[in-house]
Regions:
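Catalytic alpha-helical scaffold of carbohydrate-active enzymes acting on polysaccharides/glycoconjugates
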Residues: 1-136, 141-186, 212-233, 239-288
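Glycine-rich, positively charged active-site loop/lid region within alpha/beta enzyme cores that binds
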Residues: 182-203
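Surface-exposed cleft-lining segments at the edges of enzyme active sites
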Residues: 134, 197-209, 237-238
Length: 288
């Protein structure tokens, strides 16, 4: 599956030591619905999710603008329908909109036909906002269905960012190759900042921002030393968008840049990986 430049041995642009992806999952109050059900969450949990569109998103967009970063936002279709103006702001700022389910449904075993209908519906919503074809996929709550890669290839996706099996980008081979940009629970702000009394299905935690900064900085340093890796942060405006946390993230961005990071969006990194492997890089050439 993994070829010479498809992971181990890849050289990043301009002599950079590592590819860093600051990705955002804009889930709003739908983050945990498919696990707990709306009725199981108290209003405080729902309103905490709404902090993303109400306040956290603006802080994230402002920080990205200050640092001149264009990145990727994974947006469920239902969130784009409810918070259309906010998603338009994301697209207007030059960020990529990528698939993240329609209703952020993370049930294992969703029938393939149902999931393909979800994809078609969400793609149409996001494409109407951005004017661009959706080429990126992240499964809700990282629940990638067994047929998921095959369905991405069928629908002409360029990349996936769900699996956690290594620290480099690699290719799902086939007639229409799909790049995997792996994530890791330790790079997810949910692991450190999600706090809920009502949600018994997950942990209750709230770490200091400085603790997370040091953990992510140490991870960055070690991955950068290996020179062919990616570091894919998975962030949520409702969590990282709190005032002290977004400042922590901006400090980390500055540190990474000073120490050899290529900070880019998922589509740009995926196209680079394909090009390094002599693969087709025009996902628009694949008919849906």
């Amino acid at each position: 599956m993994i070829t010479l430049k498809n992971g181990d041995g890849i050289k990043w642009p301009h002599g950079k030591r590592i590819a860093v992806l600051l990705t955002f999952d804009f889930d709003a109050e739908y983050l945990r619905y498919s696990v707990t059900g709306q009725s199981a969450l108290g209003f405080s949990d729902i309103s905490r999710g709404q902090y993303g569109p109400h306040e956290g998103l603006k802080r994230c967009l402002d920080m990205l603008a200050r640092q001149n970063i264009k990145t990727t936002f994974f947006v469920p279709g239902i969130v784009a329908e409810k918070y259309t103006d906010e998603v338009k702001q994301i697209a207007a700022a030059g960020h990529e909109l990528a698939y993240h389910g329609y209703a952020h449904d993370a049930r294992p075993g969703i029938p393939e036909a149902e999931e393909e209908a979800n994809m078609a519906k969400a793609e149409a919503i996001l494409e109407a906002i951005s004017g661009k074809k959706v080429v990126g996929h992240r499964a809700p709550l990282d629940t990638l269905q067994t047929y998921g890669v095959k369905l991405m290839q069928k629908r002409g996706y360029l990349y996936s960012s769900t699996l956690k099996d290594c620290d480099w980008a690699y290719i799902h081979e086939g007639e229409h190759p799909v790049v995997e940009l792996p994530t890791e629970p330790g790079f997810d702000d949910f692991s450190f900042f999600y706090f809920s009394y009502a949600d018994a299905h997950t942990i209750t935690c709230s770490y200091p921002a400085e603790y997370v900064y040091n953990m992510w900085k140490d991870a960055f340093d070690e991955l950068a030393n290996e020179s062919d890796k990616i570091m894919c942060l998975k962030l949520h405006p409702q969590l990282i968008g709190r005032s002290s946390r977004i400042r922590m993230l901006e400090r980390l961005v500055l540190y990474m840049r000073q120490n050899g990071a290529w900070i880019a969006g998922c589509e740009e990194v995926a196209r680079y990986v394909l090009a390094q492997n002599g693969k087709e890089t025009d996902a628009d050439a694949v008919a849906k």
